[in-house]
Amino acid sequence: MKNEIINYIKEVGPVTMEQLADQFGAGSAKSFTDLVKLVSSMEGQRKLVFDQDGRIALPAPKVTRNRVTLQGIFHAHKSGFGFVTIVEEEDDLFVSRDNVNFAIEGDRVEIAIKKVADRLKGTAAEAEVIDILEHSLKTAVGLIVFDEDRPEYSGYIKSKNQKIAQKIYIKKSPLVLTGTEILKVDIEAYPNKKRDYFVATIRDVVGHKDDVGIDVLEVLESMDIVSEFPDEVLAEADRAPESPSEKDFEGRLDLRDEIIFTIDGADAKDLDDAIHIKQLKNGNLELGVHIADVSYYVTEGSALDQEAIKRGTSVYVTDRVVPMLPERLSNGICSLNPNVDRLTQSAIMEIDRKGKVVKHWIGQTVIKTTFRMTYSDVNDMIAGNQEKLATYKAIVPSVELMVKLHETLEAMRYKRGALNFDTSEAKIIVNKDGLPVDIQLRQRGIAERMIESFMLAANECVAEHFAKLDLPFIYRIHEEPKSEKLQKFIDYATSFGLTVYGTASSISQDALQDLMERVKDEPYADVLNMMLLRSMQQARYSEQNHGHYGLGAEFYTHFTSPIRRYPDLLVHRMVREYGHNPAEKAEHFEQVIPELAKSSSSLERRAIDAEREVEAMKKAEFMQEFVGQEFDGVVSSVVKFGLFVELPNTVEGLIHVTNLNEYYQFHERTLTLQGEKSGRVFRVGQPIRIKLTRADKMTGEIDFAHVPSELDLVEKNLKAKRKTMSHSNRDRDDRSGRGRGKNRKKEAVGRDSGRHKSGKDSKSKSGATDKKKKPFHKEVAKKDKKKRR
């Protein structure tokens, strides 16, 4: 909401508190008080000021030596230049390599404007870093390298982060280093005019370069994602009981006689959610979503709680999970294993035929699950597998009701404008040595979508319950997309000849739904879906309820995964505490929620970054075996420096413009590259044949080369033939005749080279090369086989 306030004042000028309250709907005493506190907080951060008339205004830009200066966050590019994001500005400011002045990725900097943007000429603003207010890089991880030229240091490490070019030299250490150690170091000094490198001290030896899984561990440690728990945290977890006692059941609704079951992946160990479902006499359905009561064992302020706050979320990478809580809890007392008593928090909803929750109850329960189901079990039952239907005969009626309710809820969400971002997701299979052996597409059957649907219903129900009680609460919000990003998506969609109903500022979710429905069977549907997703804002946690745009929901929170997300744990705590003494606890939660929401959002982004970096690294490592092979893909993105192409197994690589056969001009509005001579156009969603030329595990980068199609080769041969005929005509007109044979010989070699390259070589690449190395993906292999036939 801070950005919305800033943008509003930027647009209309200084305002009174009453004007601000009207603009943001702060009509109740509670919401007005919240707004006053927020404005006060922003004043303390120098984001707002009060002018001489007592109105709320933006602070005047600081002027240093007759220059306007601003503060922002520096984002580096591996080529040396960068951009600065200013909270109060829409566009980032470009900083050339000469004006970076030793700022590094993530630094909070002060900048001076060197050149003002000129929208008529299409030129962007440029800035110069004049001061580094706060360094972001505090630690680094890397392999020790000895340097005889600097004997005053133990050596240096080079960060894997491509945006940090400088070496990190390490102060002399009593440790005996062999050159195989992966070190974690604390930065003590930063590059400056006198010294073009960092200086650091050793904090820890993470491992050795040939250790199994050290590559993944290096990524995690570089982001301060630590697997090991402190001793006091483990000791506290060990004090949790093996099973709850009768005393623990006091004040809880006893649901042990209900048919309740879990549905998870086959390899899941932390079974933290379960459901029950039944038909009521009035025709409505009762859905119970039961979540492990983690907050009963993780009390506020405890060592477990403090560690969970620091971690924010569990992190899932290819070969491991870095949990938010010790396994003693997640796989033990907080896992809803079958036929044992477990403490839970439940949302029990009565849902009518239209998918509306007409009654609900939220509170503490005790349950005993009857079955531990897997997604494949349930999908088989839905598909009519007789063996599974016989094995789980007792819950067949429940599964039938689940399918019915899921369809109702899905239709309800679609009707209210929920957007379906159904993108392909990779599952990287690694062996015991941590090496990738396969990349598969994650499958999402009806069972997976049903459980997701029921969890969404519970999250909405809990959020609406506390919003209407007007109590301090933490929400999961997804704000409306910014109009300029949505405009880029609309421009892009229309470049396919699609009609988009509405403008960037007025387009409805219904119109976006309609658009995606119209293209769902087109070859570019997945890419258009991804482009729409990229136009959205990031979902985050907030003490203010702004609804969830993507879900079309007025109220939303996270209630269903307290084992792996701290906001869910906090919600469970509020459910309990507000049930006992809401007035007393409201003030406390009002104070702690804003900071917890902010830190949880930040830690979630860190986890996503780690997961993406490990995935890119493992994909590149997997593809190294297939360098030189050709495959079919789809253009997934077009930028001024080239094309990104995605293969059927979700691997993405770059065809750089310098590897195309002519000069290509980039058209930003349509996101296309057009050949200057041929007029050929590359666009997103276009099928393309590529050759894998490079796969770099260290950087996670993959490079492709474009393989011309048969049509390209025909055109090329026709042009060569026309050129030859033109030369022949000139030769006949040449009276002297000298050089005629030489020219013809050169032309003949050129034609033979062209045929050889497009004929024999192409056949060898698509045939012999593929036979020499096994195809990396069954779908691609089938396509290649069909083409050879």
Residue ranges and their predicted role:
Residues 1-288, 295-341, 372, 379-380, ...:
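Charge-lined substrate channels and their catalytic hotspots, especially those that engage the 3′ end
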Residues 105, 178-179, 627, 632, ...:
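Short, flexible surface segments
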Residues 107, 127, 656-702, 707, ...:
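Intrinsically disordered, low-complexity linker and terminal regions at domain boundaries
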Residues 114, 188, 636, 693-695:
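Short, surface-exposed secondary-structure boundary micro-motifs
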Residues 314-414:
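Conserved catalytic alpha/beta cores of large enzymes that bind or transform nucleotide phosphates
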Residues 362, 375-647, 661, 665, ...:
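Append "with occasional cross-activation on large, charged helical scaffolds in nucleic-acid assemblies
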Residues 714-789:
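Intrinsically disordered, Lys/Arg-rich low-complexity segments
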